Amino acid sequence: MAQPIGRKPEWLKIKMASGASFAATRQLLNRHSLHTVCRSALCPNLQECWSRGTATFLLLGNTCTRSCTFCAVSKASAPPAPDSDEPQKIAEAIASMKLKHAVLTSVTRDDLPDGGANHWIATMQAIRQRTPNVSLECLIPDFQHKKAALDSVMQATPDVLNHNIESVPSLYSTVRPQANYRASLELLRYAKEQHGLATKSGLMVGMGEERHEVEATLHDLAAHGCDMVTIGQYLQPSAAHLPVARYVPPQEFEEYSTIAKNAGIRYVHAAPFVRSSYHAETFPNNLTITQNL
């Protein structure tokens, strides 16, 4: 049974890390003036990931046009224009970091006619020109479900197409008011059926959902062809954000993993600190999944 809300339980204590690799990663990102979801979203795994010489690149600036109540990324209705040099900067950073698997994500840019799709494509092209052997995992927004934008990004053939479902449908009006649960599921199905992409999604628990709702969402993801799923504990970024409803014990994450696999999801990473891109490079057969569709 979950502990009552109060002090964080032992399993949620972060082990701090630093060292030369951490400093080198930070310096490289600062030198190229790049945003990362690690820093912008206050990810609890920042120290660990940067110490391993990896990071998740945040495209289209660090200001989002949506107001998800769980997210620490800055919000505004009219963010600054995207940096046209960002694709090349990211490509250079990936080459410098010698990454074999790079993870890209972005803020949602409802203010742009294409939602930032062309910027996404330019970034993927720049990376592949600079480091053609790197595999690309793209955690995309919904682009307001505009078919032209989705098709253009999917036709750029990311090795893994990630789109987070984030939560159960009953909480959407609270945690993700400008998104649509069913439409996000359809996006994943479309990526699989129409573009033959390996698909991935993630959700957080501890936001007020019921266990049976998590199980139903995992079955929904499986039914829409999702290959990979991440499940992690929601942690409140600040007092201004959605409060944590409960701390989910590690055993429950193991149970969710079993449920997801039994539903037909091919790979599951479920644990308190798991986030969408956490150890993404270790997901087995990232490329084989695509090749064996």
From Swiss-Prot:
Q: What class of enzyme is it?
A: transferase
Q: Which domain of life is it from?
A: Bacteria
Tell me what reaction this enzyme catalyses: [[Fe-S] cluster scaffold protein carrying a second [4Fe-4S](2+) cluster] + N(6)-octanoyl-L-lysyl-[protein] + 2 oxidized [2Fe-2S]-[ferredoxin] + 2 S-adenosyl-L-methionine + 4 H(+) = [[Fe-S] cluster scaffold protein] + N(6)-[(R)-dihydrolipoyl]-L-lysyl-[protein] + 4 Fe(3+) + 2 hydrogen sulfide + 2 5'-deoxyadenosine + 2 L-methionine + 2 reduced [2Fe-2S]-[ferredoxin]
Q: One GO CC term of this entry?
A: cytoplasm
Which residues are noted in the entry as [4Fe-4S] cluster 1-binding?
A: 38, 43, 49, 277
Q: Which positions make up the signal peptide?
A: none
Q: Which keywords does this chain's UniProt record carry?
A: 4Fe-4S, Cytoplasm, Iron, Iron-sulfur, Metal-binding, S-adenosyl-L-methionine, Transferase
- UniProt entry tagged with the keyword Cytoplasm: yes
Q: Which cofactor does it need?
A: [4Fe-4S] cluster
Q: What is its main location?
A: cytoplasm
UniProt-listed Enzyme Commission number(s): 2.8.1.8
Concerning InterPro entries, the annotation shows: Aldolase_TIM, Elp3/MiaA/NifB-like_rSAM, Lipoyl_synth, rSAM
Which of this chain's residues are annotated to bind [4Fe-4S] cluster 2? 64, 68, 71
Pathway assignment:
Protein modification; protein lipoylation via endogenous pathway; protein N(6)-(lipoyl)lysine from octanoyl-[acyl-carrier-protein]: step 2/2
Q: Name one Pfam family in it.
A: Radical_SAM
A GO molecular function term, named singly, is:
metal ion binding
Domain Radical SAM core as annotated: residue spans: 50-266
Sequence similarity: Belongs to the radical SAM superfamily. Lipoyl synthase family.
Recorded protein name is Lipoyl synthase
Organism of origin? Chlorobium chlorochromatii (strain CaD3)
